[in-house]
Amino acid sequence: MKEVTANKFQRVEQTDIGEEWNGTSLTYWKSVRIAFFQNKVAIITATILLIIIAMAIIYPTVSKYSYLQQDYKIRNLKPSMLHFFGTDEGGRDIFTGVWQAARISLLLGIIIALINLTIGMIYGGICSYYGGLTDDVLMRIIEILANIPLLVIVVQVNLILGPSIFTFVIAMTISGWCNIASLIRGQFIQQKEQEYILAAKALGASTSRIVSKHLMRNIISIAIVTITLEIPSIILLESMLSFIGFGSAMLSWGKMFYTASFAIHFYPYQVLMPAFVISITIICFNILGDALRDAFNPHEVVLKK
């Protein structure tokens, strides 16, 4: 047997063997942004929504027609180049009215969604963090409120306070936050068992700090998706309630439906034109919400290199 000596081996340098990483690391929010902008449908949807919001803000101000002024000489005109959506029973330009009503409908949707989200996050956070008897009692309250029909709440609040925007906001927020609170509670329960929460408790962090600095930050993505999907639901509910006479007192899309419903058999365009804008708005919000949900979920998003 030949003897193996050191001179039969050659030293191999290690400098060129190791793998080198020349790429840039992605933070969570950067990966979300990349995933969202890769979704072409989401970009188109967001652009349409921005146009709708811009039209609601700008067009009623620059339009040569005022929806508040009636002109019976041009009543019930069909859509034309002068009046894109035609005119109504009072001779008012429907195209101008749609964008003026959009101000109230969109504003109500955003305000009510923000209020419901705020109440739901606080309530759901308290339920999940303390647990036990506190959680049981608070969840029973949610079950009671959530099972009261919305129409009953709206009618009772209108009878007590009278029809107004303030009344409508109160009616929509009495039980509107319940589903959000249940969703946030479930997310909080998942998060509070994580190691970083246990570490914060071990370091002596207060309850308020743990909730605000740790738990809230980790469900912000859920909050963004929730509010995006909540807005179209509120707009649709406002339109439905205004159509049956229980909506806000000011001009809104639902109010336009209610006014045009008396002439729908003779002038269907007076309902169809506002309905088209409302449908586009609601569809865009729902598509945007789904796109945001996909972008915020790192387990389902596949980033292109």
Residue ranges of predicted features:
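Glycine-rich helix-loop "coupling/hinge" segments at transmembrane-helix boundaries
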Residues: 159-160, 172, 187-188, 236-277, ...
